[in-house]
Each structure stands twice: as structure tokens, then as C-alpha cells.
Amino acid sequence: MARKCEICGKSPATGNTVAKSKVTTRRVWKPNLQKIRVVTDEGTVRRMYVCTKCLKSGKVQKA
């Protein structure tokens, strides 16, 4: 599974975790992806990985 929203293309973001002592370690923020059944533009139904922001904003029509 690619950790990427199939609608908006949101993918994992990287950065640092900064401790109180200012020691930094790399970390990853992963998008909240849900595997749902979606009605496509052609009218067919398929399963897609969609982030919750796209679900809430109504960018996809659930089947």
C-alpha cells in the first residue's frame, strides 16, 4: 500500500522530534488514510485510499 491519498496526493511528511535538550531525531507524520468504496466519474465502483480531509470535504462520493 502506498501511503498516499488517491484524490489530493497527500503523502507522509518528514521532520524532527525536538526534545527538551534540543536533541533532534527524524520522524514521519503519516496521513489518515481510509480504504473506502468510491463511485468514480465513469460511474464504476472501486476501492481507494482516501484521506479523511477529502472525505469530510465531500471530494469523493461513497458507494
From Swiss-Prot:
One of its GO terms (cellular component) is ribosome. Belongs to the bacterial ribosomal protein bL28 family. PANTHER family: 50S RIBOSOMAL PROTEIN L28, LARGE RIBOSOMAL SUBUNIT PROTEIN BL28A. Keywords: Ribonucleoprotein, Ribosomal protein. InterPro entries: Bacterial_rp_bL28 (IPR050096), Ribosomal_bL28 (IPR026569), Ribosomal_bL28/bL31-like_sf (IPR034704), Ribosomal_bL28_bact-type (IPR001383), Ribosomal_bL28_sf (IPR037147). Gene3D superfamilies: 2.20.150.30, Ribosomal protein L28/L24. NCBIfam families: L28. GO terms for molecular function: structural constituent of ribosome. The keyword Ribonucleoprotein applies. This is Large ribosomal subunit protein bL28. One of its GO terms (biological process) is translation. The gene is rpmB.
